[in-house]
Amino acid sequence: GCQPHSRILRVELELGGHEVSQADLTRVFERSHNEQLQQDRMFLHGLPVGYEIDGLHGIQDPRGMRGEKLLVRMHVVSGCRSTIRNLTNCVGRCHLDTDELVLSSYASGLASLVEDELDLGAICIDMGAGVTSIAVFRNNAMMHADAVPVGGWHVTSDIARGLDTSMRDAERLKTLFGSTIASDVDKKDMIDVPPLGERDASGPNH
């Protein structure tokens, strides 16, 4: 993965009593985009997660409101620069252009969560082969993002090692019998686990 780094940035803007305009919000977003990052990091997202005007909290959209000071909490997400460049280079070699970069867990959350889940709060877990990414949503905004270098391949590998079977058979067992939800499975149930190096099993052995 791109090793996402997630943090909340507070951006203040002096209003001088005038109404908040779209131009003001654009200035705030530009400031978050220009936030100094480490040399090996690349900016991915700058997403507003909360607005305040003169200490007033809970504002969903400040446009048209008056005040002296606007405070915007921005969720800034960055990724590993070298990994992102390798991905864009790979896309370029396929004679395709990269229009925009989107964190996979963020895209998965927007695609799979319903409006109430985004508003009330939910965590989207996107498990790939080697990386599992998460995105935390609340109040219709992504509040946090992270990733761990563990995925479905590691589960398959553990099954293969634990049952002394091949990776191919372990993947099949995971697909047919695996579940992330605990259930009352009869402990007397048996499944066929082909021994490592043997293709024909005489009967259920686990």
Annotate each language-model stretch with its function.
Residues 1-123, 142-143, 165-168, 172-206:
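Nucleotide/phosphate-binding catalytic cleft detector across ATP-hydrolyzing
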Residues 145-147:
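Residue-level detector of high-confidence beta-strand sites
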Residues 149-169:
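A conserved active-site cap/scaffold subdomain adjacent to cofactor or substrate pockets
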